[in-house]
């Protein structure tokens, strides 16, 4: 399996203007890496993080198909998985060459993954996974469900660490350039929530256009990234650079 854990591969989060490129973001060699493993006429599956947002999901499926074709990737189909067909389509996962795990709210997406049995469905599957934002976070064995919605940081019963898909042992935090100064429940997201939660753990905060790539023989950060561990943060990779994690 080849796992691309991205922040946003189609433009900057919270940006008002269109991205300065067509298709997928070519920064940090992501398109070249995708092409390295891409099969001609790939069958692609988009698994939504909003299982009941049917109209939004249908539009998203159309957008992804267009974006992949604009990138020059050969696509036979771009199918959609949401609550209308979840169990049925994951039982046929072996038909697909590439799976996209969409962005959204981490716990909501995780509950849907559990509902459709996605973790088990990935067993023995050998294709390309592209996680986007929450989809990248949920790839981990133990997911850090960083508080983001009102009430989550203040709620002592909110589960900040949950069982994920088990595709990696890396915890990715997306959109660092956009969220680093955010507040949740009156607390600074990074300094007062995330840094304390990193005690005894390691998180990698990445900016949009950056990603983590894990294959059978490689585990790399591509682009701007920051290592958060034991309450401290430091930059470990810059745009255009590669950091091997093993």
Where are the model-predicted features located?
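C-terminal and late-domain segments of enzyme folds
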Residues: 1-40, 58, 62, 145, ...
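Glycine-rich nucleotide phosphate-binding loop and flanking beta-alpha elements
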Residues: 11, 53, 106-107, 136-138, ...
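Short, well-ordered alpha-helix to beta-strand connector turns
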Residues: 41, 96, 125-126, 168
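A residue-level signal for conserved active-site and pocket-lining positions in enzyme catalytic cores
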Residues: 44, 99, 133, 172, ...
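Portal/gating segments that form or line small-molecule/metal binding sites
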Residues: 45-108
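Catalytic-core regions built around general acid/base machinery
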Residues: 92, 115-127
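Catalytic nucleophile loop
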Residues: 100-102, 123-142
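Glycine/threonine-rich flexible loop motifs
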Residues: 106-115, 182
